[in-house]
Amino acid sequence: MDVENLIITTLKDKVKELTGTEMDIRLEEPPAINMGDYSTNISFRLAKDLKKAPKMIAEDIANSLSISGIERIEAVNGYINFFMNYPDFSKETVSKITSEKENFGKLEKRGEKVILEHTSANPNGPFHIGHGRNMVIGDSLKRILIASGYDVETQYYVNDMGRQEAIVVFGNERFELDKSKKADHAIGEVYVETNKLLAENEELEQEILNLMKNYESACEAGIENELTEKFKNAVDYSLGGFKETLSTLNIYHDKFVWESEFVKSGMVRDVIKRLMDTGKVVEDEVFRLDLSDYGLEKKLVLARLNGTSLYSTRDIAYHINKMENCDFAVNLLGADHKLTAVLVNKTLALLGYNEAEVVFYEFISLPEGSMSTRRGRFISMDELFEEAKSRAAEEVRKRGVAQSEEEIEEIAKKIAVGAVRYNIVRIAPEKPMVFRWDEALDFEKVGCPVIQYAHARCSRILENVENISNDNLFAYEMNENEKTIVKLLSKLPKIVEKAAEVRKPQIVANYVLDVAQGFNKFYANCPVLKEENETIKNSRLAIVSTTKTVLENTLDLLGIEMPGKM
Protein backbone atom coordinates (compact mmCIF):
# COMPACT_ATOMS: atom_id res chain seq x y z
CA MET A 1 0.00 0.00 0.00
CA ASP A 2 1.44 3.40 -1.01
CA VAL A 3 0.21 5.47 1.92
CA GLU A 4 1.75 8.71 0.64
CA ASN A 5 -0.05 8.55 -2.71
CA LEU A 6 -3.28 7.54 -0.97
CA ILE A 7 -3.11 10.68 1.20
CA ILE A 8 -2.42 12.87 -1.86
CA THR A 9 -5.33 11.35 -3.83
CA THR A 10 -7.71 11.76 -0.88
CA LEU A 11 -6.65 15.39 -0.37
CA LYS A 12 -7.07 16.17 -4.08
CA ASP A 13 -10.60 14.79 -3.95
CA LYS A 14 -11.32 16.87 -0.85
CA VAL A 15 -10.03 20.08 -2.45
CA LYS A 16 -12.17 19.46 -5.54
CA GLU A 17 -15.19 18.87 -3.30
CA LEU A 18 -14.55 22.17 -1.45
CA THR A 19 -13.55 24.42 -4.36
CA GLY A 20 -14.58 22.68 -7.57
CA THR A 21 -11.00 22.97 -8.82
CA GLU A 22 -7.90 20.78 -8.77
CA MET A 23 -4.78 21.52 -6.77
CA ASP A 24 -1.25 20.12 -6.99
CA ILE A 25 -0.47 18.62 -3.59
CA ARG A 26 2.87 17.68 -2.11
CA LEU A 27 3.43 16.26 1.33
CA GLU A 28 6.20 17.18 3.73
CA GLU A 29 7.74 14.87 6.30
CA PRO A 30 7.85 16.42 9.80
CA PRO A 31 11.32 16.52 11.40
CA ALA A 32 10.33 14.02 14.11
CA ILE A 33 8.09 10.98 13.78
CA ASN A 34 6.07 11.96 16.89
CA MET A 35 4.87 15.01 14.92
CA GLY A 36 3.42 12.78 12.21
CA ASP A 37 4.62 10.86 9.19
CA TYR A 38 3.32 13.29 6.58
CA SER A 39 2.08 16.86 6.71
CA THR A 40 0.36 19.33 4.37
CA ASN A 41 -0.14 23.09 4.34
CA ILE A 42 -3.12 23.09 1.94
CA SER A 43 -5.29 24.93 4.50
CA PHE A 44 -3.18 28.05 3.97
CA ARG A 45 -3.56 27.75 0.19
CA LEU A 46 -7.34 27.30 0.49
CA ALA A 47 -7.90 30.17 2.95
CA LYS A 48 -8.47 32.85 0.30
CA ASP A 49 -10.96 30.79 -1.76
CA LEU A 50 -12.87 29.49 1.25
CA LYS A 51 -12.69 32.82 3.13
CA LYS A 52 -11.84 31.00 6.35
CA ALA A 53 -8.86 30.86 8.69
CA PRO A 54 -6.34 28.11 7.85
CA LYS A 55 -6.70 26.74 11.40
CA MET A 56 -10.44 26.17 10.92
CA ILE A 57 -10.00 24.69 7.44
CA ALA A 58 -7.36 22.26 8.76
CA GLU A 59 -9.63 21.13 11.59
CA ASP A 60 -12.61 20.65 9.23
CA ILE A 61 -10.56 18.61 6.75
CA ALA A 62 -8.85 16.52 9.47
CA ASN A 63 -12.22 15.63 11.02
CA SER A 64 -13.76 14.68 7.66
CA LEU A 65 -11.07 12.32 6.35
CA SER A 66 -10.66 8.58 6.76
CA ILE A 67 -7.69 7.03 4.96
CA SER A 68 -6.70 3.37 4.87
CA GLY A 69 -3.35 2.85 6.61
CA ILE A 70 -3.65 6.10 8.58
CA GLU A 71 -4.21 5.68 12.30
CA ARG A 72 -5.05 9.30 13.06
CA ILE A 73 -5.12 12.77 11.51
CA GLU A 74 -4.38 15.90 13.54
CA ALA A 75 -4.80 19.61 12.76
CA VAL A 76 -2.07 21.75 14.36
CA ASN A 77 -1.93 25.52 13.75
CA GLY A 78 -3.32 25.19 10.24
CA TYR A 79 -1.21 22.18 9.27
CA ILE A 80 -2.71 18.72 8.80
CA ASN A 81 -0.54 15.88 10.13
CA PHE A 82 -1.03 12.21 9.25
CA PHE A 83 0.07 9.34 11.51
CA MET A 84 0.43 5.89 9.95
CA ASN A 85 -0.84 2.63 11.41
CA TYR A 86 2.66 1.26 12.08
CA PRO A 87 1.86 -2.36 12.97
CA ASP A 88 0.08 -2.85 9.62
CA PHE A 89 2.58 -0.73 7.68
CA SER A 90 5.56 -2.57 9.22
CA LYS A 91 4.10 -6.02 8.48
CA GLU A 92 3.47 -5.02 4.89
CA THR A 93 6.95 -3.48 4.46
CA VAL A 94 8.76 -6.47 5.97
CA SER A 95 6.69 -8.90 3.90
CA LYS A 96 7.42 -7.03 0.67
CA ILE A 97 11.18 -6.80 1.27
CA THR A 98 11.39 -10.44 2.42
CA SER A 99 9.56 -11.75 -0.63
CA GLU A 100 11.29 -9.52 -3.21
CA LYS A 101 14.80 -9.89 -1.69
CA GLU A 102 17.43 -8.58 -4.15
CA ASN A 103 14.65 -7.23 -6.38
CA PHE A 104 13.30 -4.88 -3.72
CA GLY A 105 13.81 -1.36 -5.04
CA LYS A 106 13.68 -2.38 -8.71
CA LEU A 107 10.89 -0.89 -10.82
CA GLU A 108 8.98 -2.35 -13.76
CA LYS A 109 10.60 -2.41 -17.20
CA ARG A 110 9.89 0.78 -19.18
CA GLY A 111 10.75 -0.51 -22.65
CA GLU A 112 13.14 2.41 -23.25
CA LYS A 113 16.82 2.17 -24.20
CA VAL A 114 19.41 4.57 -22.83
CA ILE A 115 22.97 4.97 -24.08
CA LEU A 116 25.08 6.30 -21.23
CA GLU A 117 28.59 7.47 -22.06
CA HIS A 118 31.03 7.93 -19.23
CA THR A 119 34.76 8.00 -18.42
CA SER A 120 36.04 8.23 -22.06
CA ALA A 121 39.51 9.41 -20.99
CA ASN A 122 42.17 9.77 -23.66
CA PRO A 123 44.40 6.64 -23.81
CA ASN A 124 47.62 8.54 -23.09
CA GLY A 125 48.18 7.79 -19.40
CA PRO A 126 46.46 6.42 -16.30
CA PHE A 127 43.14 7.70 -14.97
CA HIS A 128 43.53 10.58 -12.53
CA ILE A 129 40.99 11.32 -9.82
CA GLY A 130 39.09 13.69 -12.12
CA HIS A 131 38.39 10.71 -14.38
CA GLY A 132 37.50 8.84 -11.19
CA ARG A 133 34.65 11.22 -10.46
CA ASN A 134 33.32 10.69 -13.99
CA MET A 135 33.49 6.89 -13.86
CA VAL A 136 31.98 6.57 -10.36
CA ILE A 137 29.06 8.91 -11.06
CA GLY A 138 28.55 7.32 -14.49
CA ASP A 139 28.54 3.72 -13.27
CA SER A 140 26.28 4.54 -10.31
CA LEU A 141 23.85 6.30 -12.64
CA LYS A 142 23.87 3.27 -14.96
CA ARG A 143 22.95 0.95 -12.08
CA ILE A 144 20.19 3.29 -10.87
CA LEU A 145 18.71 3.67 -14.37
CA ILE A 146 18.69 -0.12 -14.80
CA ALA A 147 16.96 -0.54 -11.42
CA SER A 148 14.37 2.04 -12.45
CA GLY A 149 13.43 -0.06 -15.49
CA TYR A 150 15.53 1.30 -18.34
CA ASP A 151 17.55 -0.85 -20.74
CA VAL A 152 20.99 0.77 -20.40
CA GLU A 153 24.04 0.41 -22.63
CA THR A 154 27.22 2.03 -21.32
CA GLN A 155 29.75 3.27 -23.84
CA TYR A 156 33.33 4.46 -23.63
CA TYR A 157 34.27 6.78 -26.50
CA VAL A 158 37.88 6.05 -27.43
CA ASN A 159 39.76 9.04 -28.81
CA ASP A 160 42.28 7.32 -31.07
CA MET A 161 42.62 10.16 -33.63
CA GLY A 162 43.67 13.15 -31.56
CA ARG A 163 47.03 14.82 -31.12
CA GLN A 164 47.57 13.04 -27.79
CA GLU A 165 47.47 9.60 -29.40
CA ALA A 166 49.78 10.73 -32.20
CA ILE A 167 52.24 11.82 -29.48
CA VAL A 168 52.03 8.36 -27.89
CA VAL A 169 52.65 6.62 -31.23
CA PHE A 170 55.56 8.99 -31.96
CA GLY A 171 56.96 8.40 -28.46
CA ASN A 172 56.70 4.62 -28.70
CA GLU A 173 59.22 4.79 -31.58
CA ARG A 174 61.71 6.71 -29.43
CA PHE A 175 61.25 5.52 -25.86
CA GLU A 176 61.00 1.99 -24.59
CA LEU A 177 57.77 0.99 -22.86
CA ASP A 178 58.39 -0.25 -19.33
CA LYS A 179 56.55 -3.58 -19.59
CA SER A 180 57.05 -4.21 -15.86
CA LYS A 181 54.53 -1.44 -15.14
CA LYS A 182 50.77 -1.40 -15.55
CA ALA A 183 50.06 -0.67 -19.23
CA ASP A 184 48.41 2.75 -18.91
CA HIS A 185 51.14 3.95 -16.52
CA ALA A 186 53.85 2.83 -18.97
CA ILE A 187 52.07 4.68 -21.80
CA GLY A 188 51.75 7.73 -19.54
CA GLU A 189 55.51 7.78 -18.94
CA VAL A 190 56.16 7.67 -22.69
CA TYR A 191 53.65 10.49 -23.21
CA VAL A 192 55.33 12.70 -20.59
CA GLU A 193 58.84 12.05 -21.97
CA THR A 194 57.65 12.75 -25.53
CA ASN A 195 56.07 16.05 -24.47
CA LYS A 196 59.43 17.07 -22.98
CA LEU A 197 61.15 16.13 -26.25
CA LEU A 198 58.64 18.16 -28.29
CA ALA A 199 59.03 21.18 -26.01
CA GLU A 200 62.80 21.10 -26.58
CA ASN A 201 62.59 20.39 -30.35
CA GLU A 202 59.78 22.41 -31.93
CA GLU A 203 60.64 21.18 -35.43
CA LEU A 204 59.32 17.73 -34.44
CA GLU A 205 55.78 19.11 -34.23
CA GLN A 206 55.40 18.64 -37.99
CA GLU A 207 55.96 14.90 -37.53
CA ILE A 208 53.05 14.77 -35.07
CA LEU A 209 50.81 16.57 -37.58
CA ASN A 210 51.91 14.17 -40.33
CA LEU A 211 51.06 11.17 -38.13
CA MET A 212 47.57 12.55 -37.48
CA LYS A 213 46.98 13.33 -41.16
CA ASN A 214 48.30 9.97 -42.42
CA TYR A 215 46.26 8.03 -39.85
CA GLU A 216 43.07 9.85 -40.83
CA SER A 217 43.79 9.32 -44.54
CA ALA A 218 44.28 5.59 -43.97
CA CYS A 219 41.06 5.37 -41.94
CA GLU A 220 39.13 7.31 -44.58
CA ALA A 221 40.40 5.01 -47.32
CA GLY A 222 39.67 1.92 -45.22
CA ILE A 223 43.33 0.91 -45.40
CA GLU A 224 45.06 -1.13 -42.71
CA ASN A 225 48.80 -0.61 -42.75
CA GLU A 226 51.80 -0.39 -40.42
CA LEU A 227 50.71 3.03 -39.14
CA THR A 228 47.12 2.02 -38.33
CA GLU A 229 48.54 -1.03 -36.56
CA LYS A 230 50.77 1.22 -34.43
CA PHE A 231 47.81 3.37 -33.40
CA LYS A 232 45.68 0.31 -32.68
CA ASN A 233 48.37 -1.35 -30.57
CA ALA A 234 49.09 1.80 -28.56
CA VAL A 235 45.40 2.40 -27.82
CA ASP A 236 44.68 -1.26 -27.02
CA TYR A 237 47.66 -1.40 -24.69
CA SER A 238 46.47 1.63 -22.75
CA LEU A 239 42.85 0.41 -22.68
CA GLY A 240 44.06 -2.85 -21.13
CA GLY A 241 45.35 -0.85 -18.16
CA PHE A 242 42.17 1.23 -18.04
CA LYS A 243 40.01 -1.89 -17.88
CA GLU A 244 42.03 -3.20 -14.92
CA THR A 245 41.37 0.01 -12.96
CA LEU A 246 37.70 0.04 -13.90
CA SER A 247 37.31 -3.62 -12.94
CA THR A 248 38.93 -3.01 -9.54
CA LEU A 249 36.20 -0.44 -8.87
CA ASN A 250 33.44 -2.78 -10.17
CA ILE A 251 32.94 -0.72 -13.34
CA TYR A 252 32.32 -2.36 -16.71
CA HIS A 253 31.41 -0.79 -20.07
CA ASP A 254 29.18 -2.58 -22.56
CA LYS A 255 30.95 -1.11 -25.55
CA PHE A 256 34.18 0.71 -26.42
CA VAL A 257 33.46 2.88 -29.46
CA TRP A 258 36.50 4.10 -31.38
CA GLU A 259 36.48 7.58 -32.88
CA SER A 260 38.06 6.27 -36.10
CA GLU A 261 35.05 3.99 -36.73
CA PHE A 262 33.08 7.00 -37.96
CA VAL A 263 35.82 8.07 -40.36
CA LYS A 264 36.20 4.52 -41.71
CA SER A 265 32.46 4.12 -42.26
CA GLY A 266 32.20 7.39 -44.20
CA MET A 267 29.79 8.77 -41.60
CA VAL A 268 32.02 11.78 -40.80
CA ARG A 269 32.22 12.72 -44.48
CA ASP A 270 28.42 12.40 -44.70
CA VAL A 271 27.92 14.60 -41.62
CA ILE A 272 30.15 17.32 -43.09
CA LYS A 273 28.16 17.21 -46.36
CA ARG A 274 24.80 17.38 -44.55
CA LEU A 275 25.96 20.36 -42.52
CA MET A 276 27.34 22.10 -45.64
CA ASP A 277 23.91 21.63 -47.23
CA THR A 278 22.19 23.52 -44.39
CA GLY A 279 23.60 26.81 -45.68
CA LYS A 280 24.86 27.57 -42.16
CA VAL A 281 28.55 26.93 -42.86
CA VAL A 282 30.92 29.88 -43.22
CA GLU A 283 34.50 29.76 -44.45
CA ASP A 284 37.57 31.58 -43.14
CA GLU A 285 40.77 29.72 -42.21
CA VAL A 286 38.50 26.70 -41.51
CA PHE A 287 34.86 25.75 -42.08
CA ARG A 288 32.65 26.92 -39.20
CA LEU A 289 29.01 26.17 -38.44
CA ASP A 290 26.87 29.21 -37.62
CA LEU A 291 24.50 28.33 -34.77
CA SER A 292 23.24 31.88 -34.13
CA ASP A 293 19.66 30.67 -34.76
CA TYR A 294 20.04 28.86 -31.42
CA GLY A 295 21.33 31.95 -29.63
CA LEU A 296 24.98 30.91 -29.85
CA GLU A 297 27.58 33.51 -30.82
CA LYS A 298 30.44 31.01 -30.99
CA LYS A 299 30.62 29.00 -34.20
CA LEU A 300 31.44 25.29 -34.21
CA VAL A 301 34.71 24.57 -36.03
CA LEU A 302 33.63 21.90 -38.47
CA ALA A 303 36.51 20.93 -40.76
CA ARG A 304 39.79 22.11 -42.20
CA LEU A 305 39.68 23.75 -45.64
CA ASN A 306 41.18 20.58 -47.14
CA GLY A 307 38.05 18.75 -45.94
CA THR A 308 39.74 16.68 -43.23
CA SER A 309 37.69 16.27 -40.09
CA LEU A 310 38.22 17.58 -36.59
CA TYR A 311 37.33 16.12 -33.21
CA SER A 312 34.05 18.07 -33.21
CA THR A 313 32.87 16.54 -36.51
CA ARG A 314 33.71 13.04 -35.37
CA ASP A 315 31.94 13.73 -32.06
CA ILE A 316 28.79 14.76 -33.92
CA ALA A 317 28.93 11.56 -36.02
CA TYR A 318 29.27 9.55 -32.80
CA HIS A 319 26.27 11.33 -31.27
CA ILE A 320 24.15 10.72 -34.36
CA ASN A 321 25.06 7.05 -34.13
CA LYS A 322 23.95 7.07 -30.48
CA MET A 323 20.69 8.89 -31.16
CA GLU A 324 19.78 6.44 -33.91
CA ASN A 325 20.17 3.53 -31.49
CA CYS A 326 18.44 4.68 -28.29
CA ASP A 327 15.44 6.51 -26.90
CA PHE A 328 17.69 8.99 -25.13
CA ALA A 329 21.39 9.46 -24.43
CA VAL A 330 23.16 10.68 -21.32
CA ASN A 331 26.75 11.97 -21.26
CA LEU A 332 28.99 12.47 -18.22
CA LEU A 333 31.24 15.48 -18.81
CA GLY A 334 33.48 17.79 -16.83
CA ALA A 335 32.12 21.30 -16.27
CA ASP A 336 34.85 22.65 -18.59
CA HIS A 337 33.03 20.97 -21.52
CA LYS A 338 29.77 22.94 -21.15
CA LEU A 339 30.15 25.11 -24.25
CA THR A 340 31.30 22.19 -26.42
CA ALA A 341 28.30 20.12 -25.26
CA VAL A 342 25.89 22.93 -26.19
CA LEU A 343 27.50 23.33 -29.63
CA VAL A 344 27.24 19.58 -30.32
CA ASN A 345 23.64 19.42 -29.08
CA LYS A 346 22.51 22.38 -31.21
CA THR A 347 24.21 20.82 -34.23
CA LEU A 348 22.21 17.64 -33.57
CA ALA A 349 19.03 19.73 -33.34
CA LEU A 350 19.89 21.42 -36.66
CA LEU A 351 20.09 17.98 -38.27
CA GLY A 352 16.77 16.91 -36.73
CA TYR A 353 18.03 14.69 -33.89
CA ASN A 354 17.24 14.73 -30.19
CA GLU A 355 19.81 16.39 -27.99
CA ALA A 356 21.85 14.36 -25.51
CA GLU A 357 21.31 14.93 -21.81
CA VAL A 358 24.48 15.97 -20.05
CA VAL A 359 25.41 15.45 -16.41
CA PHE A 360 28.24 17.86 -15.67
CA TYR A 361 30.61 17.40 -12.76
CA GLU A 362 33.00 19.86 -11.17
CA PHE A 363 36.65 19.29 -10.36
CA ILE A 364 37.88 17.00 -7.63
CA SER A 365 41.18 17.44 -5.84
CA LEU A 366 43.17 16.09 -2.93
CA PRO A 367 44.29 18.41 -0.15
CA GLU A 368 47.84 17.90 -1.47
CA GLY A 369 47.10 20.02 -4.57
CA SER A 370 46.31 19.94 -8.26
CA MET A 371 46.90 17.46 -11.09
CA SER A 372 48.40 17.67 -14.56
CA THR A 373 48.75 14.67 -16.88
CA ARG A 374 50.98 16.47 -19.39
CA ARG A 375 53.72 17.33 -16.90
CA GLY A 376 53.47 13.97 -15.20
CA ARG A 377 52.32 15.35 -11.84
CA PHE A 378 48.97 13.89 -10.84
CA ILE A 379 47.34 11.42 -8.49
CA SER A 380 46.19 8.35 -10.40
CA MET A 381 43.07 6.39 -9.48
CA ASP A 382 45.32 3.36 -8.97
CA GLU A 383 47.36 5.26 -6.37
CA LEU A 384 44.21 6.54 -4.69
CA PHE A 385 42.78 3.03 -4.46
CA GLU A 386 46.03 1.49 -3.16
CA GLU A 387 46.26 4.18 -0.49
CA ALA A 388 42.63 3.51 0.50
CA LYS A 389 43.31 -0.23 0.67
CA SER A 390 46.44 0.26 2.77
CA ARG A 391 44.61 2.50 5.25
CA ALA A 392 41.64 0.11 5.36
CA ALA A 393 43.92 -2.89 6.02
CA GLU A 394 45.51 -1.03 8.92
CA GLU A 395 42.05 -0.43 10.43
CA VAL A 396 41.02 -4.08 9.91
CA ARG A 397 44.19 -5.28 11.69
CA LYS A 398 43.49 -2.89 14.56
CA ARG A 399 39.96 -4.26 14.96
CA GLY A 400 41.16 -7.87 14.92
CA VAL A 401 38.22 -9.21 12.89
CA ALA A 402 40.24 -11.15 10.28
CA GLN A 403 41.96 -14.51 10.79
CA SER A 404 44.68 -14.20 8.12
CA GLU A 405 46.49 -11.69 5.89
CA GLU A 406 44.49 -13.04 2.95
CA GLU A 407 41.23 -12.25 4.74
CA ILE A 408 42.54 -8.80 5.75
CA GLU A 409 43.33 -8.14 2.07
CA GLU A 410 39.85 -9.25 0.97
CA ILE A 411 38.02 -7.13 3.57
CA ALA A 412 40.31 -4.13 2.99
CA LYS A 413 39.67 -4.24 -0.78
CA LYS A 414 35.90 -4.02 -0.29
CA ILE A 415 36.26 -1.24 2.27
CA ALA A 416 38.61 0.63 -0.10
CA VAL A 417 36.24 0.34 -3.08
CA GLY A 418 33.43 1.58 -0.84
CA ALA A 419 35.54 4.41 0.56
CA VAL A 420 36.57 5.68 -2.89
CA ARG A 421 33.24 5.22 -4.66
CA TYR A 422 30.97 6.39 -1.85
CA ASN A 423 33.05 9.45 -0.96
CA ILE A 424 32.89 10.57 -4.59
CA VAL A 425 29.23 9.79 -5.31
CA ARG A 426 27.76 11.28 -2.12
CA ILE A 427 28.69 14.81 -3.24
CA ALA A 428 26.45 16.47 -5.86
CA PRO A 429 28.35 16.43 -9.21
CA GLU A 430 27.87 20.17 -9.70
CA LYS A 431 29.85 20.91 -6.52
CA PRO A 432 33.67 21.01 -6.55
CA MET A 433 35.00 18.50 -4.03
CA VAL A 434 38.14 17.75 -2.07
CA PHE A 435 38.72 14.05 -1.46
CA ARG A 436 39.54 13.78 2.25
CA TRP A 437 40.74 10.53 3.82
CA ASP A 438 39.20 11.26 7.21
CA GLU A 439 35.77 11.36 5.51
CA ALA A 440 36.28 8.50 3.05
CA LEU A 441 37.38 6.05 5.75
CA ASP A 442 35.21 7.42 8.55
CA PHE A 443 33.73 4.51 10.55
CA GLU A 444 31.55 6.78 12.71
CA LYS A 445 29.60 9.40 10.73
CA VAL A 446 29.76 9.96 6.95
CA GLY A 447 31.99 7.34 5.31
CA CYS A 448 30.98 4.15 3.55
CA PRO A 449 32.45 2.10 6.44
CA VAL A 450 29.51 3.36 8.55
CA ILE A 451 27.14 1.65 6.11
CA GLN A 452 29.24 -1.49 5.68
CA TYR A 453 29.60 -1.76 9.46
CA ALA A 454 25.82 -1.52 9.93
CA HIS A 455 25.50 -4.41 7.46
CA ALA A 456 28.16 -6.42 9.34
CA ARG A 457 26.17 -5.83 12.52
CA CYS A 458 23.02 -7.20 10.86
CA SER A 459 24.95 -10.26 9.68
CA ARG A 460 26.33 -10.87 13.16
CA ILE A 461 22.87 -10.67 14.79
CA LEU A 462 21.38 -13.07 12.23
CA GLU A 463 24.33 -15.50 12.30
CA ASN A 464 22.68 -18.11 14.51
CA VAL A 465 19.03 -17.30 13.74
CA GLU A 466 17.52 -20.21 11.83
CA ASN A 467 14.12 -18.73 11.09
CA ILE A 468 12.03 -15.73 12.09
CA SER A 469 8.44 -16.46 13.09
CA ASN A 470 5.84 -14.33 11.31
CA ASP A 471 3.27 -14.85 14.07
CA ASN A 472 1.90 -11.59 15.45
CA LEU A 473 4.69 -9.45 14.00
CA PHE A 474 4.52 -5.86 15.31
CA ALA A 475 1.47 -6.59 17.48
CA TYR A 476 2.69 -4.20 20.18
CA GLU A 477 3.29 -0.49 20.75
CA MET A 478 6.30 0.19 18.52
CA ASN A 479 8.82 2.81 19.65
CA GLU A 480 10.11 5.70 17.55
CA ASN A 481 13.39 3.98 16.62
CA GLU A 482 11.51 0.98 15.22
CA LYS A 483 9.07 3.18 13.30
CA THR A 484 11.85 5.33 11.87
CA ILE A 485 13.90 2.45 10.47
CA VAL A 486 10.86 0.65 8.99
CA LYS A 487 9.73 3.86 7.28
CA LEU A 488 13.23 4.38 5.89
CA LEU A 489 13.39 0.82 4.53
CA SER A 490 10.07 1.25 2.72
CA LYS A 491 11.39 4.24 0.75
CA LEU A 492 13.93 2.47 -1.48
CA PRO A 493 11.70 2.12 -4.59
CA LYS A 494 10.80 5.83 -4.49
CA ILE A 495 14.43 6.79 -3.92
CA VAL A 496 15.44 4.79 -7.01
CA GLU A 497 12.67 6.39 -9.06
CA LYS A 498 13.60 9.91 -7.99
CA ALA A 499 17.38 9.46 -8.43
CA ALA A 500 16.83 8.04 -11.93
CA GLU A 501 14.38 10.76 -12.88
CA VAL A 502 16.68 13.65 -11.94
CA ARG A 503 19.93 11.76 -12.78
CA LYS A 504 21.36 12.30 -9.29
CA PRO A 505 23.02 9.22 -7.75
CA GLN A 506 23.86 11.21 -4.61
CA ILE A 507 20.19 10.79 -3.63
CA VAL A 508 20.82 7.05 -3.27
CA ALA A 509 24.10 7.68 -1.42
CA ASN A 510 22.45 9.99 1.11
CA TYR A 511 19.55 7.59 1.57
CA VAL A 512 21.71 4.54 2.35
CA LEU A 513 23.63 6.52 4.98
CA ASP A 514 20.27 7.50 6.54
CA VAL A 515 19.32 3.80 6.65
CA ALA A 516 22.62 2.86 8.32
CA GLN A 517 22.31 5.65 10.88
CA GLY A 518 18.65 4.81 11.50
CA PHE A 519 19.60 1.19 12.07
CA ASN A 520 22.41 2.15 14.45
CA LYS A 521 19.94 4.13 16.58
CA PHE A 522 17.54 1.19 16.52
CA TYR A 523 20.39 -1.18 17.51
CA ALA A 524 21.47 1.08 20.38
CA ASN A 525 17.96 1.43 21.81
CA CYS A 526 16.14 -1.79 20.95
CA PRO A 527 17.49 -5.11 22.31
CA VAL A 528 17.10 -7.86 19.72
CA LEU A 529 18.55 -11.22 20.78
CA LYS A 530 18.23 -10.36 24.48
CA GLU A 531 14.56 -9.31 24.17
CA GLU A 532 12.43 -11.72 26.23
CA ASN A 533 9.07 -11.01 24.58
CA GLU A 534 8.98 -13.37 21.56
CA THR A 535 6.67 -11.13 19.49
CA ILE A 536 8.94 -8.12 19.96
CA LYS A 537 12.09 -10.22 19.42
CA ASN A 538 10.82 -11.70 16.14
CA SER A 539 9.63 -8.29 14.95
CA ARG A 540 13.04 -6.79 15.64
CA LEU A 541 14.78 -9.71 13.95
CA ALA A 542 12.57 -9.03 10.91
CA ILE A 543 13.74 -5.40 10.99
CA VAL A 544 17.39 -6.53 11.14
CA SER A 545 16.91 -8.98 8.26
CA THR A 546 15.17 -6.46 6.00
CA THR A 547 17.70 -3.74 6.87
CA LYS A 548 20.45 -6.11 5.72
CA THR A 549 18.62 -6.63 2.41
CA VAL A 550 18.06 -2.91 1.84
CA LEU A 551 21.69 -2.05 2.64
CA GLU A 552 22.88 -4.71 0.17
CA ASN A 553 20.47 -3.63 -2.58
CA THR A 554 21.24 0.06 -2.15
CA LEU A 555 25.02 -0.23 -2.03
CA ASP A 556 24.82 -2.47 -5.10
CA LEU A 557 23.29 0.55 -6.89
CA LEU A 558 26.53 2.37 -6.05
CA GLY A 559 28.78 -0.55 -7.11
CA ILE A 560 29.87 -1.32 -3.56
CA GLU A 561 30.17 -4.75 -1.94
CA MET A 562 29.83 -5.76 1.71
CA PRO A 563 32.88 -7.13 3.58
CA GLY A 564 30.59 -9.23 5.81
CA LYS A 565 32.61 -8.51 8.93
CA MET A 566 34.47 -5.43 10.08
Swiss-Prot record:
The GO biological-process annotations, alphabetized, read as: arginyl-tRNA aminoacylation
Compartment(s) where it occurs, according to its Swiss-Prot or TrEMBL record: Cytoplasm
Reaction(s) the record says it catalyses: tRNA(Arg) + L-arginine + ATP = L-arginyl-tRNA(Arg) + AMP + diphosphate
Identify the domain of life. Archaea
Which EC number(s) are documented for this chain?
6.1.1.19
TM region(s), chain numbering: none
What is the protein named? Arginine--tRNA ligase
State the similarity comment.
Belongs to the class-I aminoacyl-tRNA synthetase family.
Asked if the record carries the keyword Repressor, the reply is: no
One Pfam match, given by its short name, reads Arg_tRNA_synt_N
Tell me which UniProt keywords the record has, alphabetically: Aminoacyl-tRNA synthetase, ATP-binding, Cytoplasm, Ligase, Nucleotide-binding, Protein biosynthesis
Recall the GO molecular function terms of this protein's record: arginine-tRNA ligase activity; ATP binding
